[in-house]
Amino acid sequence: MNIAHAVEQAGLRPTDIERIVVGIGPAPFTGLRAGIVAAKALAFATGAELVGQDALSPQTQLVDEYASDDACHLTLAINDARRRQLYFMLMDSARGSAMPRTLVGMDIDYPQSIVRRVDAAVELLRADRPNVRYVVDVVGHGASKYAMTWDSLAALGSVSDDTLLDKGAYGLERFASFATSDESLARPVPVEPLYLRRPDVSVPNPLKHVLNHAGADKTE
């Protein structure tokens, strides 16, 4: 995207920008870092406030759009992390608050392991409130890819590949509104990339010494 062209199309000047919202992941390394660096540079150049927002928490808003029954809908927000893994987070947004309650914190794991962890969290909720019917809605990139795995969830609701960031201007507005709500701004997060996966690069082991080898001597 040409940022200067987008600003011009909106009838604005760069100095009119007061706040910039940037996604901080979790996502793969290269694209995530490039986006954050661009946002930081633009904020520095314009003097705009810079706000970071993770990609998973706002997904509760998508579930709220079609959760019309009397069940307590929990959101399993996911994002494809490649290598048959998913970034994920389990949240409960049906508590009269704009900020969802985290039930399983943001992490990376294999789909089968995610199912076990989510089922364990739901069991704890049921033990505390046995008369409540809980439903887990799975939403985000990778949801349909692992649809057969989600079938083993004890309280499966809907499964959707939707994300707010796929919905054009409407989705971006919802994403930004979530990031700039009073509750979000009261708990600012560092504008740094969320990778979650451990780096592949490791420090190599030192070279082994050959037994009884004193090394080469320098000759004149």
Feature map (PLM): residue ranges:
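Acyltransferase
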Residues: 158-220
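N-terminal beta-alpha supersecondary unit
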Residues: 1-26
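DPxDG-like acidic metal-binding loop motif
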Residues: 21-55
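Stable alpha-helical structural segments in soluble proteins, enriched in small hydrophobic residues
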Residues: 2, 6-10, 45, 63, ...
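Surface "functional belts" at beta-alpha junctions
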Residues: 49-166, 195, 200, 215-218
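Phosphate-handling active-site elements
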Residues: 10-15, 43-53, 70, 184
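Generic structural marker for isolated residues within well-ordered, non-membrane alpha-helices
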Residues: 3, 39, 60
